[in-house]
């Protein structure tokens, strides 16, 4: 399921390479609604642009589906509570399947920590350094007049670490944060935007 049918069709190539049958394709602005209405699926995995995470998850839960959702699961606190309440009322799971917490490397490292390979973990350091320059053109754009795409537009309007769980999540898991221990203080800092600012101004022709 993808907003753009061509992107959804391209995924069929992966199935073909794996010697698997073609999947049903759903596309367009409301394609996910048709997908969620099916009675032969149990779980909807959401890896769309961030603004669509909540409406797709809400639709899936309302149609009796379990939900695995990429980070962030919602764009504000009210949407978070809406998902919690909906999950509880429908008795369906709504799980944040954070790719940098549950990828093979992170799960392997967590397994090693839990089995004492590192001894008693008393200090940890994590990071997520990611140059997005090669990817800006691959993010979904809403029509020909959208020069930035959803991701660059979001970075332009918001400051700071927009998905801190990439670097912090695996460390918190290894330290059992919220599984017997908890954070008492959190300090966050960032620098001014340089490369992103230049890129936005180059694409829009406007100073930001």
Predicted features and spans:
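A structured beta-alpha segment of the ubiquitous adenosine-cofactor-binding alpha/beta core
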Residues: 23-42, 46
């Amino acid at each position: 399921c993808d907003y753009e049918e061509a992107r959804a069709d391209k995924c069929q190539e992966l199935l073909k390479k794996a010697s698997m049958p073609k999947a049903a394709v759903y596309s367009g602005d409301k394609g996910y609604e048709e997908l969620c209405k099916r009675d032969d699926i149990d779980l909807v995995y959401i890896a769309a642009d961030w603004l669509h995470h909540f409406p797709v998850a809400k639709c899936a839960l309302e149609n009796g589906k379990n939900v695995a959702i990429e980070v962030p699961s919602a764009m504000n606190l009210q949407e978070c509570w809406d998902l919690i309440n909906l999950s509880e009322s429908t008795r369906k799971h709504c799980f944040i399947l954070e790719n940098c917490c549950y990828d093979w490397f992170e799960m392997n490292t967590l397994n090693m920590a839990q089995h004492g390979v590192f001894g008693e973990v008393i200090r940890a350091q994590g990071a997520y350094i990611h140059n997005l320059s090669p990817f800006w053109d691959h993010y979904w754009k809403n029509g020909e007049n959208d020069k930035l795409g959803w991701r660059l537009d979001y970075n332009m309007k918001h400051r700071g670490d927009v998905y801190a769980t990439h670097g912090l999540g695996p460390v918190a898991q290894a330290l059992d944060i919220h599984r017997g221990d908890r954070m008492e203080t959190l300090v966050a800092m960032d620098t001014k935007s340089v490369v992103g600012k230049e890129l936005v101004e180059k694409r829009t022709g406007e100073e930001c």
